Curated annotation (Swiss-Prot):
Residues 138-171 form a coiled coil. The lineage of its organism: Eukaryota, Fungi, Dikarya, Ascomycota, Pezizomycotina. This is Respiratory supercomplex factor 1, mitochondrial. Keywords: Coiled coil, Membrane, Mitochondrion, Transmembrane, Transmembrane helix. Signal peptide: none annotated. GO terms for cellular component: mitochondrial membrane; mitochondrion. Associates with the respiratory chain complex III/complex IV supercomplex. Its main location: mitochondrion. Belongs to the RCF1 family.
Amino acid sequence: MPSNTPLPSSFDGDTDFYEENRWQKLTRRLKEEPLIPLGKSTHTLTLSPSPPSLHHPSTQKLTHPLTHPPGCILTTLALVGATRSIRAGDHNRTQRMFRARIYAQGFTLLAMVAGSMYWDSDRKKRKEFEGVLAEQKAKEKNEAWIKELEARDEEEKEMRRMRDERRRRAEGKSAASGLVVDAANAGAEEGEKTKNGIVDQMKGMVWGKK
């Protein structure tokens, strides 16, 4: 029978956050990996430090920070400013914009490292949850397969029982027909014997008179 045990209650209400499509995963990666948290959001996730415990998980609340792509934005602005200064012939401003682009790229690299460190524990919890979820789905699939096999086995037993019942009925009818035929034959033989006995008696009487 399939297990009715739900997933950890600490994950209830946030399942959609973990079961993501490709676009959601891409968006989350872009937000988490290269960026440094600049503020706090009000979105709160309740995570279990030990997801395998499905009955009494202890919970802790983690506040996910709101992040922005400052390095990417600054790099883009520096390139746009450099392009405009080149068209305007302002070489000094062009040099400043290129230096700003280098600084922005350095900031982006630092943001990638810092963001990766910041989200490391969250990624571990996510992988742990995904492992539990995959194991739960595999278990449910296996139990459903076993249930289907059991249902087919019961159906096969029922069909076999019906065939045996029909065969017994047919054998019973054949036996009853045989008894009727035997009784009829016995009656015919008895009648023939009686007839022969009467004929013999009549013959004896006739021959006795002579």
